[in-house]
């Protein structure tokens, strides 16, 4: 799953997406500045607009959804 997230992070243009967790939680990633995926791939860091951040185990990520509205509008 981290490989999929890396592809989204490096996409040009960046398209916002949501990470869905196994426990039903979800975290929105509105910009590339709101996420970091270290080289090891076992964890994902998602940053809020405030000083808050979440450290996720990649094993707990159940799916990723791309913001279709942003994806459509970015292509003109």
Model regions and ranges:
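Motif-centric detector for short Cys/His coordination patterns
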Residues: 1-76
